Amino acid sequence: MNTRFVRHSYLALLLGLSIFAVSVRLGAEQADSRLFAVVGIASEIAPVEARLEGAIVSRIRGIVFTAGTIDGMRIVTARSGVGKVSASMAATLLLDHFSPSAVIFSGTAGAVDIELNPLDVVIGTGVGYHDYGDVTPEGLVRSPTRDYASGRIDPAFFPAGPDLLAAARKAAKEMKETRVREGLIVTGDAFMASPARRTELRRELNAVAVEMEGAAVAQVCSRFGVPAIVIRSITDRADGSAAQSYAKYRDPAARNAADLAVRTIRELAKSK
């Protein structure tokens, strides 16, 4: 056997595979301007998945992605688990493997603004963490997250993508039977069922709704340079009856949020 030939052939194969891998990676970094993504926990993203035509389901690292079309619009959904880490993982894999041009997190939330009622929909003008910072003798001192690789300090609240926000506002006008509000949505790794804590979030952050995933997805999207927005529908008042109210209103609230998410994509697609 000609060992030199075998060695050279092997090196050529490795070089070819490396070039192929780089070309695929570069392609993945180019956002697909006609592809839109909707992320949500499995039970709350179901209304979007049910509307997808020609659906193709794939699983990456345990995360389920479904690609298809709605009224000709190309959409991929990602099933996030509950909480910030699960949401971050789903968003990272979504952006890395599918390269959508925009991301919407669709789901439910607890009301921080007591004027909100179950099944109302909230457009997040911004989203941030309510439980990130330093615990001092005086209590929690909130601070922004940081990209330690670059040294960049993130904004205290991640703003919604301007085009997404404009599209959501326009789409909301079509939802005649659903009350739509907008404001700051805050994220933390605990299900909120405390009137005192709810009052604190309203007083200190001027938040309107609280949930467990949105800011994590927005932070990942910010790192990737992809616009994002969080759309939530209210299930409860984040008080002592939150668990029972969530169980009662989860499904119809998820449908309301999904409806606005799809309408938002439709408005956004008109400009593409």
Where are these regions (language model features)?
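N-terminal secretory signal peptides that target proteins for export/translocation
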Residues: 1-6
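General helical structural elements
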Residues: 8-11, 236
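Bacterial N-terminal signal peptides
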Residues: 10-21
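Boundary at the C-terminal end of the N-terminal hydrophobic targeting segment
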Residues: 26-29
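Glycine-rich phosphate- or other oxyanion-binding loops that anchor nucleotides, phosphorylated ligands
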Residues: 31-35, 59-272
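N-terminal targeting signals for Sec/Tat export/insertion, comprising classic cleavable signal peptides
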Residues: 35-63
